[in-house]
């Protein structure tokens, strides 16, 4: 719900549809084409088929949320493939991209002179949030935080039925990564 509302705020303030605002102020600034990062599937033959584990509790309850006969194919070696579909919910998960496009996004965020965000706002973006009593929430602005071998990182995951993507940034180290799966979640 939060990202849907944020998308509406962006539309109200900018006067542009959410997809147009993101395309103009983020995607085009990175020099990416709509086939690299955007809100449409340009060539479904180049997209990976998404899968969900066939014999799993989550697959059992998945039928409560969608018509599996309409959106999923027959099981393949323990996995159920999703048929081509697009989630109509751009602010909360409608961006489709390649690994190279997300790497370009991460690289720009790590630059001192990012084309996407002013340095003072970037510092706020990766700053830990705290509750009113000072307890860390484990989140920044739209990023979750964690530690790996003593190094702090910020990450954001996305996906949907049959897909999972996570970008991770280590702000203090100046490095980042992207990982993509054509299966639901990491488990």
Spans of model-derived segments:
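Short, well-ordered beta-strand elements
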Residues: 155-157, 165-183
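Catalytic cores of secreted or luminal carbohydrate-active enzymes
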Residues: 186-187
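Short, surface-exposed loop or secondary-structure junction motifs
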Residues: 1-161
């Amino acid at each position: 719900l939060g990202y849907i509302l944020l998308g509406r705020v962006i539309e109200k303030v900018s006067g542009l549809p959410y997809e147009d605002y993101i395309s103009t102020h983020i995607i085009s600034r990175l020099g990416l084409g709509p086939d690299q990062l955007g809100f449409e599937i340009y060539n479904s033959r180049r997209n990976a088929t998404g899968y969900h584990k066939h014999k799993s509790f989550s697959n059992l309850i998945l039928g409560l949320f969608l018509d599996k006969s309409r959106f999923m194919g027959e099981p393949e070696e323990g996995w159920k493939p999703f048929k081509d579909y697009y989630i109509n919910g751009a602010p909360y998960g409608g961006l489709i991209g390649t690994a190279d496009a997300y790497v370009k996004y991460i690289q720009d965020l790590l630059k001192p002179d990012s084309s996407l965000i002013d340095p003072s706002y970037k510092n706020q973006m990766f700053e830990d949030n705290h509750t009113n009593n000072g307890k860390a929430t484990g989140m920044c602005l739209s990023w979750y935080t964690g530690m790996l071998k003593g190094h702090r990182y910020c990450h954001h995951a996305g996906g949907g039925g049959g897909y999972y993507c996570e970008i991770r940034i280590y702000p203090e180290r100046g490095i980042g990564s992207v990982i993509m799966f054509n299966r639901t979640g990491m488990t």
